[in-house]
Regions:
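Short alpha-helical donor nucleotide-sugar binding micro-motif in glycosyltransferases
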Residues: 146, 154-159
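Acceptor-binding helix/loop patch of EC 2.4 sugar-transfer enzymes
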Residues: 1-28
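Short hydrophobic beta-strand element within catalytic cores of glycosyltransferases
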Residues: 184-187
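Conserved acidic donor-binding segment of nucleotide-sugar-dependent glycosyltransferases
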Residues: 202-209, 218-223
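Conserved donor-binding/catalytic core segment of Leloir-type glycosyltransferases
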Residues: 77-95, 101-104
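Nucleotide-activated donor-binding/catalytic signature segment of Leloir-type glycosyltransferases, i.e.
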Residues: 128-150
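Aromatic "clamp/platform" in nucleotide-sugar-dependent glycosyltransferases that forms part
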Residues: 167
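Carbohydrate-associated surface elements
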Residues: 43, 65
């Protein structure tokens, strides 16, 4: 909630977020009394402890899982040499799309044919559309929505670099989806993201189009090196975020909770 408020200076947006998160008052009362909480990242665990005043010993971290067969590289699928891909809901400042767009403008000088694919919607006459016009990027950005998982996989397979420029992520599915599809990844070094990427992505500071620009350029100019990192990144995702591992962790904690409940004195 507080990260969304910090991400935008617009009063109207802040009011809408305040109304949306009004249920948090109830959660703050209930959460400290819950004996077992499961959350998908260490970062979100810290947030629950700090914001909801919960006992850290009552909180278990179990990552979200991913079907790594659905999100996988496609053999003999040609990559567009200078295509970038990102996932962002337009006009949601927390996703940091502005900084990717500003970096794209800078990159056009060195890579005139560069193109950005955004998986998400664009709001008619909204902030993002206005920024694209201001930067003269109308022909260089394409928004795609209502896609199947296979279509998303094809977009990753046909792109050369993925960017996650979020200002906050409680988990961050676009991170592990991109890594599972074996595409070089640039991601912000915030909240849960570095937990997911380990050493298999180029981490940058948030709100920094200069770092996005430099990172994309570096990957373009030494692609074989970074595609090898991406291959190791997929192995990392398969090992740590496969559904068999995740369901076993859930089974273990649920069984433990049931056992503690049966042994409790009421």
């Amino acid at each position: 909630y507080k990260y969304e408020l910090q991400s935008s200076k617009k009063i109207k947006y802040k009011i809408s977020r305040y109304r949306w998160y009004s249920f948090l008052k109830m959660q703050k009362k209930v959460a400290p009394n819950i004996k077992r909480i499961i959350t998908p990242s260490i970062s979100s665990k810290k947030g629950i402890v700090n914001e909801f005043k919960c006992n850290k010993n009552n909180i278990t971290v179990i990552n979200n899982g991913l079907d790594t067969n659905e999100f996988a590289p496609i053999e003999n699928f040609s990559r567009n040499k200078h295509r970038i891909i990102t996932t962002a809901s337009a006009d949601v400042p927390l996703k940091g799309l502005d900084y990717s767009l500003k970096a794209l403008k800078m990159l056009k000088k060195d890579f005139p044919k560069i193109h950005l694919i955004v998986i998400g919607n664009i709001k008619k006459n909204g902030h993002t559309e206005r920024l694209i016009k201001k930067l003269s990027l109308e022909e260089d950005v394409t928004f795609k929505s209502n896609l199947t998982k296979h279509q998303i996989k094809e977009l990753y397979a046909s792109s050369s670099v993925a960017i996650v420029s979020s200002l906050y992520e409680g988990f961050g599915y676009p991170v592990i989806e991109a890594m599972s599809c074996e595409i070089p990844l640039i991601a912000t070094n915030v909240s849960a993201i570095p937990e997911l990427t380990s050493n298999y992505a180029r981490l940058i500071e948030p709100k920094n189009e200069e770092m996005i620009f430099n990172s994309v350029k570096e990957i373009f100019l030494d692609y074989p090196k970074h595609i090898e990192v991406a291959r190791k990144g997929r192995e990392h995702v398969i090992k740590n975020f496969n559904w068999i591992k995740i369901t076993e962790e859930y089974e273990k904690i649920i069984s433990k909770t049931i056992e503690e409940f049966n042994n409790a004195n009421f």
